[in-house]
Amino acid sequence: MAKATFGAGCFWGVEASFRQLHGVQDVAAGYEGGKLDNPTYRDVCTDLTGHAEVVEIDFNPDEIRFEQLLEAFFGLHDPTQLNRQGPDWGTQYRSVIFYHSPEQQTVAQAFIDRLTAEKRFPRPIVTQVVPAATFWRAEEYHQRYLEKRGLATCHI
């Protein structure tokens, strides 16, 4: 089993999308990259903690490669928007890859370089690639948020 952690705006739709991929064993919504221990949603929404809304993914690398997760990640959001996705704005909604190994760092950066060379997006990619920090699981009401409400997607 391996881990991947991505921030791509509001975590509700991101979580639901990654859950659908074969080889993904579990997805948890949470917060990462900030300076406050055990932050709450209310804390993170102040835009003062430095945390991003993220999903932490447990996946089987024999069934799905990290590159496939990256392809899904870049297809889920606009990685050229700085600190926002759609109507949501603030640093908590930044585009970020928290890598769990030097290999993930190398693969993620090479993936971004390839997307840039291919001109896949009309503006520069602003996705951060940073070492994984402490993942703080979000409150239970955020877990499987869309599923619990009978929704298939949100605005991402």
UniProtKB/Swiss-Prot annotation:
EC number in record: 1.8.4.11
Lineage: Bacteria, Pseudomonadati, Acidobacteriota, Terriglobia, Terriglobales
Family that this chain belongs to: Belongs to the MsrA Met sulfoxide reductase family.
Example GO molecular function: peptide-methionine (S)-S-oxide reductase activity
GO BP terms in the entry: protein modification process
Organism: Acidobacterium capsulatum (strain ATCC 51196 / DSM 11244 / BCRC 80197 / JCM 7670 / NBRC 15755 / NCIMB 13165 / 161)
Identification of the protein by name: Peptide methionine sulfoxide reductase MsrA
Purpose: Has an important function as a repair enzyme for proteins that have been inactivated by oxidation. Catalyzes the reversible oxidation-reduction of methionine sulfoxide in proteins to methionine.
InterPro entries membership: Met_Sox_Rdtase_MsrA_dom (IPR002569), Met_Sox_Rdtase_MsrA_sf (IPR036509)
